[in-house]
């Protein structure tokens, strides 16, 4: 029987687990429930995907968004894993075909929305087959204290209880205060769970806050975006009107930008999201409707044009940057108007006729006001931003991180901050190197010759992705390409030693990359 390490290497192409991952994998394999709080980019999915391939039956992954399911399943299929998703983006015929194949044993991992668990057809399927594990992704959605509460998550427990044999349950989230963790534990009725918080810190992320009047924000944004060159980024706005105006502003300056919000036609949203994932668009301007579950690893900056409603939302949205571990920037543009806008939405929620009792709505408003208070403190503090954020999530931190605007430039204005941004990126790269010797190879500067090789590998990846009709990062991540440049593998064995190269991907893409590397290396000798 295969062991977790062999699955990790053969399927996903990693030599070793990240901190916290192996313990979670082994607990799930032993049948112990798990509650794991791991920051975006820490590798939550590996924690349930590896045991899913080792357990005898099927793993059901409960996921809140169609985009997350599509992204995760696409990456698994590229790695050679039998995975599928079942949601309303499929036609009735496609759903019927997927369920028939699931009954026939085609799949090891199936992603579904929580609402799907209540549907008779899916319940019959789950009764017939061995469900070995139920994974609850974005588990904070089960808590009224969480920033993304979804009542449908409260019905996951009933589904688990209805199965002939209780599966092991794993609950995963990137952001959860102690109150939210209590809710997850109780609402899912986890059985003596193994609880782990791997730490919220993302050393490769540089955090910055800027106070700017609404009239100043367009210029601030343009300056920030233009300094990023061709880097992929996300700009978050608080209203759909602001999203549309900001996208038009960027487009008017020749920047490849697209908009994403709930008022756009579903087909337009899908196209714009795909354009961003496939690198046809450089910048996505969006409300918080965009991002949860988006697994694009090479987002180099996230700018919040408006202050979010709480630190949970901010940390999750900012965490879309730098998922590949390379230095990235998270910048918040703050004005007092942002607070008034958020209070307007809180009051609107109170007045909504949503069937909730008045006392429940009042309590929800009180919780929202409390979270807003801490978000405002973060936006205006002159102390270390990273420390403030980590302390909010219950984690100790040094007094100064050396990689946020308050630590580096407390006495300087925004123009001076920009002049020293390169130094901040260097510090982030140094922090990333301390995390992992393997990452050391991917974070540093490259020689001119290696830059040409990297450009050739990027171009090759783009062509291969187009043939497969998948986003480029699903072929190989930026970090994997950088390691290829550093290591310059010239044989399949050497290629398989590159982080992120599993056996299926090596078989599919290996010879093309080896030829490209050999052509460039040979031309210099």
Name each model feature, range by range.
Residues 21-24, 375, 481:
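Short alpha-helical "packing" element that flanks the helix-turn-helix/winged-helix DNA-binding module
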Residues 2-11, 15-19, 23-45, 52-55, ...:
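Helicase motor core with emphasis on the C-terminal RecA-like subdomain
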Residues 27, 304, 378, 483-484:
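Short alpha-helical segment immediately N-terminal to, or the first helix within
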Residues 67:
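Conserved catalytic helix of short-chain dehydrogenase/reductases
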Residues 1-4, 340-341, 346-361, 367-373, ...:
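Accessory DNA-binding and partner-docking regions appended to nucleic-acid-acting proteins
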């Amino acid at each position: 029987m295969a062991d977790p390490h062999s699955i990790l290497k053969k399927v996903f192409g990693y030599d070793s687990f990240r901190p916290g991952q192996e313990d979670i994998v082994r607990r799930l394999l032993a049948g112990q429930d798990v509650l794991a709080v791991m920051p975006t980019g820490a590798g939550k999915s590996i924690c349930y995907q590896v045991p899913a391939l080792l357990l005898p039956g099927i793993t059901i992954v409960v996921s809140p968004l169609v985009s997350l399911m599509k992204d995760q399943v696409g990456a698994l299929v590229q790695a050679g894993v039998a995975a599928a998703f079942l949601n309303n983006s499929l036609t009735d015929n496609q759903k019927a075909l997927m369920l028939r194949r699931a009954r026939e044993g085609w799949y090891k991992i199936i992603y579904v929305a929580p609402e799907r668990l209540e549907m008779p057809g899916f319940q019959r399927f789950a009764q017939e087959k061995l469900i070995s594990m139920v994974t609850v992704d974005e588990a904070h959605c089960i808590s009224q204290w969480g920033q993304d509460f979804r009542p449908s998550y409260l019905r996951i427990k009933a589904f688990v209880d209805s199965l002939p044999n209780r599966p092991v349950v794993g609950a995963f989230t990137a952001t959860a205060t102690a109150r939210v963790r209590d809710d997850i534990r109780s609402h899912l009725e986890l059985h003596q769970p193994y609880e782990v918080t791997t730490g919220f810190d993302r050393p490769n992320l540089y955090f910055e806050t800027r106070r700017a009047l609404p009239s100043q924000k367009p210029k601030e944004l343009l300056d920030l975006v233009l300094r990023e060159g061709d880097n992929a980024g996300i700009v978050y706005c608080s209203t759909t009107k602001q999203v549309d105006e900001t996208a038009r502003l960027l487009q008017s300056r020749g920047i490849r930008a697209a908009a994403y919000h709930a008022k756009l036609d579903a087909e337009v949203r899908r196209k714009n999201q795909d354009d961003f994932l496939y690198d046809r668009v450089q910048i996505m301007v969006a409300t918080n409707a965009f991002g949860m579950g988006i697994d694009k690893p090479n987002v180099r900056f996230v700018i919040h044009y408006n202050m979010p409603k709480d630190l949970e939302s901010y940390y999750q949205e900012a965490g879309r940057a730098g998922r590949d571990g390379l230095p990235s920037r998270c910048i918040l543009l703050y004005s007092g108007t942002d607070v008034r806008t958020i209070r307007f939405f809180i009051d609107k929620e109170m007045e909504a006729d949503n069937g909730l009792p008045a006392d429940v709505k009042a309590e929800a408003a009180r919780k929202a006001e409390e979270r807003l208070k801490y978000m405002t403190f973060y936006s205006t503090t002159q102390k270390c931003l990273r420390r403030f954020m980590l302390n909010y999530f219950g984690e100790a931190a040094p007094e100064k991180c050396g990689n946020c605007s308050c630590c580096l430039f407390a006495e300087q204005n925004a123009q001076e901050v920009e002049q020293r941004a390169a130094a901040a990126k260097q510090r982030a790269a140094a922090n990333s190197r301390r995390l992992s010797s393997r990452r050391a190879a991917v974070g540093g500067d490259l020689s001119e010759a290696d830059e040409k090789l990297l450009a050739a590998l990027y171009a090759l990846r783009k062509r291969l992705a187009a043939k497969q009709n998948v986003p480029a990062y699903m072929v190989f991540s930026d970090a994997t390409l950088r390691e290829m440049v550093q290591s310059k593998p010239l044989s399949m064995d050497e290629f398989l030693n590159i982080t992120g190269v599993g056996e299926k991907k090596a078989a599919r893409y290996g010879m093309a990359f080896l030829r490209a590397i050999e052509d460039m290396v040979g031309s210099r000798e």
